[in-house]
């Protein structure tokens, strides 16, 4: 092979590095905007979903994610909507499992848990070792109210099934003022008893919720952490898992608690991730509107070179950080799209 051709071939598969020298090694891909819940902070109750023809096929998702793995992505998280309501979704997990140990270190998903009892064993067979479950309350009535359509017992059964299949479960809880403040210690205690990690998340300024309503629900995690510190000894952990969370250990229980605080602590300096929507849009930052269309080069032909070039061009536009800010009564940087479309 001529030297210039060799260099071009090498460059085609060089790792993705953004303008701020951050390697891009973590891809979150939304496989559907549909969900069997209607969580109030995530989507409208009578949601207008995208036409199915606009969604990437499972084969296109395979090709797109495989291109990212070839460019150095080592962690792939499948999201939605609710990923497990996508028809034949296990075909996609089986396809992605071939990359484990061959470039991909971890295949995982974020789910509301409603379909976990059905799919836990298959997911484990595909190499999924960890699963994040969104759970904001252990009160059945509150759960029905916040999810509108969800049933708490179904989710708890799914969590048990995941645990029985050998997967480690992490609970993601959105901190909502006036909703689950009084359940803080109940959630911590339950996770300790069950052996689950727990991460608290600040409500983000996305979707249709009005500014005043979102501000009324906003519970700064600095306050939540102070409340935990009144009952437990919190030891900061240096551990980083490739995500935005910062962790502490509760010395009395030994459990790990995470805090995702995009609004009061900018976690952008170490950002290593990008997001693909179910329609093939690449968002370089959750808190910015800039995006790149990857569906067009994906459908232009079987050759992956234009697709890789489009990915590189997009990564070259990745910003230094987001614009979320709740320090003022105005929600600076509010983003109009739904998390169910971008991928939660």
UniProtKB/Swiss-Prot annotation:
CDD domains: Radical_SAM, Twitch_MoaA. Binds 2 [4Fe-4S] clusters. Binds 1 [4Fe-4S] cluster coordinated with 3 cysteines and an exchangeable S-adenosyl-L-methionine and 1 [4Fe-4S] cluster coordinated with 3 cysteines and the GTP-derived substrate. GO terms for molecular function: 4 iron, 4 sulfur cluster binding; cyclic pyranopterin monophosphate synthase activity; GTP 3',8'-cyclase activity; GTP binding; metal ion binding; S-adenosyl-L-methionine binding. PROSITE patterns: MOAA_NIFB_PQQE (PS01305), RADICAL_SAM (PS51918). GTP binds at residues 28, 77, 110, 170, 273-275. It comes from the Bacteria. Its cofactor is [4Fe-4S] cluster. Residues 19-244 form the Radical SAM core domain. Its EC number is 4.1.99.22. S-adenosyl-L-methionine binds at residues 41, 81, 134, 204. Belongs to the radical SAM superfamily. MoaA family. Catalyzes the cyclization of GTP to (8S)-3',8-cyclo-7,8-dihydroguanosine 5'-triphosphate. This is GTP 3',8-cyclase. It comes from Paracoccus denitrificans (strain Pd 1222). The gene is moaA.
């Amino acid at each position: 092979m001529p030297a210039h051709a060799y260099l071009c071939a090498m460059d085609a598969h060089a790792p993705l590095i953004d303008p701020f020298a951050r390697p891009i090694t973590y891809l979150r891909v939304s496989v559907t905007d549909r969900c069997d819940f209607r969580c109030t902070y995530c989507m409208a109750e009578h949601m207008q979903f995208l036409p199915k023809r606009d969604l990437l096929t499972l084969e296109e998702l395979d090709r797109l994610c495989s291109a990212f793995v070839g460019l150095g992505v080592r962690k792939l998280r499948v999201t939605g909507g609710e990923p497990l309501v996508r028809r034949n979704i296990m075909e996609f997990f089986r396809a992605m499992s071939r990359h484990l140990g061959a470039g991909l270190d971890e295949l995982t998903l974020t789910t509301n848990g409603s379909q976990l009892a059905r799919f836990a064993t298959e997911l484990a067979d595909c190499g999924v070792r960890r699963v994040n479950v969104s759970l904001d309350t252990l009160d059945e009535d509150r759960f029905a109210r916040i999810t509108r359509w969800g049933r708490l017992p179904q989710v708890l059964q799914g969590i048990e099934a995941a645990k029985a299949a050998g997967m480690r479960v992490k609970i993601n809880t959105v901190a909502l003022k006036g909703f689950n403040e009084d359940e803080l210690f109940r959630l911590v205690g339950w996770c300790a008893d069950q052996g689950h990690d727990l991460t608290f998340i600040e409500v983000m300024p996305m979707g249709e919720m009005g500014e005043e309503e979102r501000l009324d629900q906003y519970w700064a995690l600095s306050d939540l952490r102070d409340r935990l510190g009144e009952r437990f000894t919190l030891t900061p952990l240096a551990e980083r898992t490739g995500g935005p969370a910062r962790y502490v250990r509760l010395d009395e229980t030994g459990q790990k608690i995470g805090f995702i605080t995009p609004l009061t602590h900018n976690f952008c300096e170490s950002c290593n991730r990008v997001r693909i929507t179910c329609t093939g849009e690449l968002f370089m930052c959750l808190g910015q509107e800039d995006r790149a269309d990857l569906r067009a080069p994906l459908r232009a032909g079987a050759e992956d070179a234009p697709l890789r070039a489009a990915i590189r061009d997009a990564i070259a536009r990745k910003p230094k950080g987001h614009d979320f800010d709740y320090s003022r009564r105005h929600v600076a940087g509010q983003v109009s799209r739904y998390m169910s479309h971008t991928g939660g």
